[in-house]
């Protein structure tokens, strides 16, 4: 799953005009993720920007791609949850099923609208922070493919967890 997330990050970077080779991306991603063990949880994104800059990539693009990738990952996770678990959620509380479907619909609509919404939002944030925004707009296909990769990574997490559960729990016989 990390290989998929790294590739998704690379695609977002390349879409913003900052291509990075896969080996360098793995190195940057792996070292930056060590920052999650430092209290504050923001160190990973900062480290990602600094390490990517050492590789000749814009630190702003690297951090922005990491934040956007995280948002796409969270939305894809909610989407997978809604598709795979809405009936189970409805057993606990009927409104959870409706809420999960609503969140998933919002994510899909948001992902479809993202190519239109992202450029002005990024320009506003860049002006507010006093930094240069990305040199180019992310291609629509890159956003959607990155979202699909994130959804696939959630499916892989689920399959791995199912294999773990099956491997460590005794088989129930009828």
Per-range role (PLM):
Residues 10-13, 49-50, 63:
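Juxtamembrane transmembrane-helix termini in multi-pass membrane transport proteins
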Residues 48-52, 70-72, 85-92:
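Short alpha-helical linear motifs
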Residues 62-73, 104-112:
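Alpha-helical transmembrane segments of integral membrane proteins, especially early/N-terminal helices
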Residues 3-7, 38-49, 161:
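Transmembrane helix boundary and interhelical junction motifs in multipass membrane proteins
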């Amino acid at each position: 799953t990390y290989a998929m997330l790294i590739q998704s990050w690379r695609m977002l970077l390349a879409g913003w005009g900052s291509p990075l080779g896969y080996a360098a991306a793995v190195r940057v991603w792996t070292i930056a993720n060590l920052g999650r063990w430092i209290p504050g949880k923001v160190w990973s994104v900062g480290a990602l920007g600094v390490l990517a800059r050492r590789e000749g990539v814009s630190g702003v693009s690297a951090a922005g791609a990491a934040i956007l990738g995280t948002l796409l990952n969270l939305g894809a996770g909610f989407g997978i949850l809604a598709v795979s678990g809405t009936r189970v959620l409805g057993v606990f509380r009927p409104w959870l099923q409706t809420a999960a479907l609503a969140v998933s619909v919002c994510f899909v609509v948001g992902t479809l609208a993202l190519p239109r919404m992202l450029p002005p939002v990024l320009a506003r944030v860049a002006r507010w922070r006093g930094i240069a925004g990305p040199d180019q707009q992310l291609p629509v296909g890159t956003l959607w493919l990155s979202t699909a990769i994130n959804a696939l990574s959630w499916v892989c997490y689920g399959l791995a967890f199912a294999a773990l559960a099956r491997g460590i729990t005794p088989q129930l016989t009828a």
